[in-house]
UniProtKB/Swiss-Prot annotation:
The keyword rRNA-binding does not apply. This is Glutamate-1-semialdehyde 2,1-aminomutase. The lineage of its organism: Archaea, Thermoproteota, Thermoprotei, Thermoproteales, Thermoproteaceae. HAMAP family: HemL_aminotrans_3. It is an enzyme of class 5 (isomerase). It catalyses: (S)-4-amino-5-oxopentanoate = 5-aminolevulinate.
């Protein structure tokens, strides 16, 4: 059996494509990717015994921190009762009620296993409900790894779907239209040209899969106004933002009520889950009540539901957002201050307990702005911070997250490391 990270990764390379089971974990700028043995609170512990302050937090689900005792106890109780029934359970009803009481647009809900599944079924549902073919998505918005939405924008204001991945048939994306994010004029144009044929507009109300891009209010309001005008459905993909930016999600922050919402991450408390929900008349089309098919052996898995229910109830008990948001605020202020004192151009974006930073001048409002950032310098920053015990997200195209476990002492240590890293970067630059 492999005894250290290098040996284990060598074995992994022979077993998994690229040595990992999700591409972002590859961390190709490091000699070996991060290999974790255990976690507690705000900390990860690697297979080589290194303790790290974690700002990835499982890429978002762990808003309470690792191994929160209430969630751990809920999972233990669930496992003691049994772990799969193929039947309705009390906890899934209770979790649905907790979601509905916070995200009021979700009048009915269907639990699935991933965010990808949630969006995939929501697209089918929208087409079934409207009888239309086209869907519209935005450049840089990620809605899961399935063919209809795994497309990017080409040149011009709007483009026919262009597959992002090998293996996707052009026919699979010929009814997917892609529009630049934060561009109201382009969105208006695509609705003028195709509005009567559009079934669904999908949007990340806060883009969290191309770094962190916060929308202009005019833009996000236009998504609702145009879909209502042309009779299309509006889907807010809140897999990341649901229960992260507040109890009411991003739709609560912006005061917009979408027709459909997709959720994941936090509603599973760190266990696999996804959900799509929305207007009662739309959701009533789902089997067995209606003709739009969805099924799954592991839908509303008892352990995932137990963890999610415990997580949301802890959030609702108070204090979680205050700690997590303050931690993110202090860290982003420290990054801005240290970068300025060291002579680096930097753009820092934060909303609630989500943040990301970019080595560039100007602002970041579109995916093109993210691409224009100095990715090499970000990776150098990441490597330097990691060597000092702080694990920021390993790509400028991802997002950092804080949690209720990021206490003032943890943040103090993080700020000390940030200051050290910028001093080291300044020395290397000269």
């Amino acid at each position: 059996m492999a005894t250290d990270a290098a040996e284990l990764f060598k074995e992994a390379l022979s077993l998994f494509p690229g040595g990992v089971n999700s591409p972002v974990r590859a961390m190709k700028h490091l000699p070996t990717p991060l290999i974790v043995k255990r976690a507690e609170g705000a900390f990860l512990y690697t297979i080589d015994g290194v303790k790290l302050i974690d700002y990835c937090m499982g890429f978002g689900p762990l808003i309470l921190g690792h191994r929160h005792p209430t969630v751990l106890e809920a999972v233990r109780r669930s496992l003691e009762d049994g772990w799969l029934y193929g039947a309705l359970t009390r906890n899934e009803v209770e979790l649905a009620k907790e979601i509905n009481s916070s995200i009021r647009s979700v009048e009915m809900i269907r639990f699935v296993n991933t965010g990808t599944e949630a969006v995939m079924n929501a697209v089918r549902l929208a087409r079934g409900f409207t009888g239309r073919r086209y869907i519209v998505k935005f450049e840089g918005n990620y809605h899961g790894a399935f063919d209809y939405v795994l497309v990017k924008a080409g040149s011009g204001a709007a483009t026919w779907g262009v597959p992002t991945s090998a293996g996707i048939l052009e026919d699979a994306v010929k009814y997917t239209l892609v529009v630049p994010y934060n561009d109201v004029e382009a969105l208006e144009r695509v609705f003028r040209e195709h509005g009567s044929e559009i079934a669904l507009l999908l949007v990340e109300p806060i883009a969290g899969n191309y770094g962190l891009i916060i929308p202009d209010l005019e833009f996000i309001k236009a998504t609702r106004e145009l879909t209502e005008r042309y009779g299309a459905l509006l889907l807010f993909d809140e897999v990341i933002t649901g229960f992260r930016v507040g109890l009411n999600g991003a739709q609560g922050l912006f005061g917009i009520k979408p027709d459909l919402t997709t959720l994941g991450k936090i509603i599973g408390g760190g266990f696999p889950i996804g959900a799509f929900g929305g207007r009662r008349d739309v959701m009533s089309m789902i089997t067995p009540q209606g003709p739009v098919y969805n099924a799954g052996t592991f839908n509303a898995h008892p352990v995932s539901v137990a963890a999610g229910l415990a997580t949301i109830r802890v959030i609702k008990s108070g204090g979680v957002y205050e700690v997590a948001n303050e931690a993110a605020e202090r860290i982003t202020e420290a990054i801005l201050d240290s970068a300025s004192r060291s002579g680096f151009d930097i753009v820092v974006k934060r909303i609630a307990s989500m943040f990301q930073f970019y080595f560039k001048k100007g602002d970041v409002k579109t995916p093109a702005d993210v691409r224009a950032s100095d990715e090499k310098l970000y990776l150098t920053f990441h490597r330097e911070a990691l060597s000092r015990g702080v694990y920021f997200t390993p790509s400028q195209y991802e997002v950092n997250f804080t949690s209720a476990a990021h206490s003032r002492d943890v943040v103090d240590e993080t700020i000390r490391v940030i200051e050290e890293v910028f001093k080291a970067l300044k020395t290397k630059a000269h």
